[in-house]
From Swiss-Prot:
InterPro entries: G_OBG (IPR031167), GTP-bd (IPR006073), GTP-bd_Obg/CgtA (IPR014100), GTP1-OBG_CS (IPR006074), GTP1_OBG_dom (IPR006169), GTP1_OBG_dom_sf (IPR036726), OBG_GTPase (IPR045086), P-loop_NTPase (IPR027417). An essential GTPase which binds GTP, GDP and possibly (p)ppGpp with moderate affinity, with high nucleotide exchange rates and a fairly low GTP hydrolysis rate. Plays a role in control of the cell cycle, stress response, ribosome biogenesis and in those bacteria that undergo differentiation, in morphogenesis control. Mg(2+) binds at residues 173, 193. This is GTPase Obg.
Length: 335
C-alpha cells in the first residue's frame, strides 16, 4: 500500500430542511389552524481515529465529503427526517487543520476518538409555531439553516515509541527488521528506505514497543535536502530517539553532531527527548575499534544487527527509557 502522510479535503455538513406551511383540513374542520411540521436537521460530519488505518491514501482519491440534507417538514405536524451523518475514518496520529487559517482543529491520537468537524444546519420551524392571537393563519415558515462547510488539511504523524535517526545506510532498516516482523527494503545503497516503516518490538512475553524507521537524513535536511526532512515529523511523537552512526563512518563524532544539528533545525524540542547513541555495523569494525564518547550523559551502545552483537543490551536500554519516560507526545500547537 502506498504511504501518504498529508492530504487536503473539503467537508460539507447537511443543510436543514425547511419548515412546512400547512393548515389542518379534515371533515367538519374546513378551516383548521396551521399544522406545518419542522424541517429535519442536516447531517453532521465526524472524524474518527482508527488504529487499523496507517495512511491518508484514501483522501488522494476522494476529496469531498457531504452529509445528508434534512428532509422538509410536512403537514399534520410531521417533522422531516434528519440528514444522514458522515463519519470519516483517519489513522491515529492525524493532525487536522483549517486549511484557510492554519488553526489546529483536532489531534486524533486515541483509537475510537471522535470529533464533530462540521455541524449540520438546524431544520426550519413550520408555520404551526408562528400562530398568535392576532395572526391565526400564518402563511410562512422558516427555511433550514446552512450546514458548516470547511476545507481541511490533514497531516499524519506516526505513533511510535522509538524513532530511528541516521544518515542513509546507517543500518536503520536492518535493525528494525531484526527487532520486529517489519520487512523494509534493505540494500547497500543510499535512500533504500523511501517511506517510514513501523515495527512492533517484543520485549518479553507481555511487553512490546513500536519502532519507527524514517528515510535517512543528510546534512542540510532541515533546508529541504534529501528525503528525510519530509518524514521527520513522524518522530515528533516518539518517547526516545535512537541516533545511529555506522562504525565505518569517516568521522563518527562529526556525523553524530550533524544529525543532532539537523534535528534541532527542524524542531528544537526533539533534542529534549531521551536518546541513545548507537554505533552500528560492528561486524565490519576493525579489532582495535574504540567506542567513542559522543555526548556527555548519553549512553553509547555498539551493535551488529547482522551478527546479533549488542542487541539485547540495546533492547533492555530502550525498554528502560520508554517505561520511565514522561514525554508528552501531543503538543498544544499540533507540531
Amino acid at each position: 500500500m502506498k504511504f501518504v502522510d498529508s492530504a487536503k479535503i473539503s467537508v460539507k455538513a447537511g443543510d436543514g430542511g425547511r419548515g412546512c406551511v400547512s393548515f389542518r383540513r379534515e371533515k367538519f374542520v374546513p378551516k383548521g389552524g396551521p399544522d406545518g411540521g419542522d424541517g429535519g436537521r442536516g447531517g453532521h460530519v465526524y472524524l474518527r481515529a482508527n488504529r487499523q488505518l496507517s495512511t491518508l491514501l484514501d483522501f488522494k482519491y476522494r476529496k469531498s465529503y457531504i452529509a445528508g440534507r434534512g428532509e422538509h417538514g410536512m403537514g399534520a405536524r410531521k417533522s422531516g427526517k434528519n440528514g444522514n451523518d458522515v463519519v470519516i475514518g483517519v489513522p491515529c496520529g492525524t493532525v487536522v487543520r483549517n486549511a484557510e487559517t492554519g488553526e489546529v482543529l483536532c489531534d486524533m491520537v486515541e483509537d475510537g476518538q471522535e470529533i464533530m468537524i462540521a455541524k449540520g444546519g438546524r431544520g426550519g420551524q413550520g408555520n404551526q409555531h408562528f400562530a398568535t392571537a392576532t395572526r391565526q393563519a400564518p402563511r410562512f415558515a422558516q427555511p433550514g439553516e446552512k450546514g458548516d462547510e470547511i476545507e481541511l488539511e490533514m497531516e499524519l504523524k506516526l505513533m511510535a515509541d522509538v524513532g530511528l535517526v541516521g544518515f542513509p545506510n546507517a543500518g536503520k532498516s536492518t535493525l528494525i527488521s531484526v527487532f520486529s516482523a517489519a520487512r523494509p527494503k534493505i540494500a547497500d545503497y543510499p535512500f533504500t528506505t523511501l517511506v517510514p516503516n513501523l515495527g512492533i518490538v517484543r520485549y518479553d512475553d507481555y511487553k512490546s514497543f513500536v519502532m519507527a524507521d524514517i528515510p535517512g537524513i543528510i546534512e542540510g535536511a532541515a533546508e529541504g535536502r534529501g528525503l528525510g526532512i519530509q518524514f521527520l515529523r513522524h518522530i515528533q511523537r516518539t518517547k526516545t530517539l535512537l541516533v545511529m552512526v555506522p562504525s565505518d563512518s569517516a568521522d563518527i563524532a562529526a556525523e553524530y553532531a550533524t544529525l543532532l544539528r539537523e534535528l534541532e533545525k527542524f524542531d528544537a524540542s526533539l533534542l529534549s527527548k531521551p536518546r541513545l547513541a548507537v554505533i552500528t555495523k560492528m561486524d565490519i569494525a576493525p579489532e582495535d575499534f574504540a567506542i567513542p564518547e559522543l555526548e556527555p550523559g548519553i549512553k553509547v551502545i555498539a551493535i551488529s544487527s547482522v551478527a546479533g552483537q549488542g542487541l539485547k543490551a540495546l533492547k533492555d536500554e530502550l525498554w528502560r527509557q520508554i517505561s520511565t519516560s514522561t514525554q508528552i507526545t501531543v503538543d498544544d500547537a499540533g507540531n
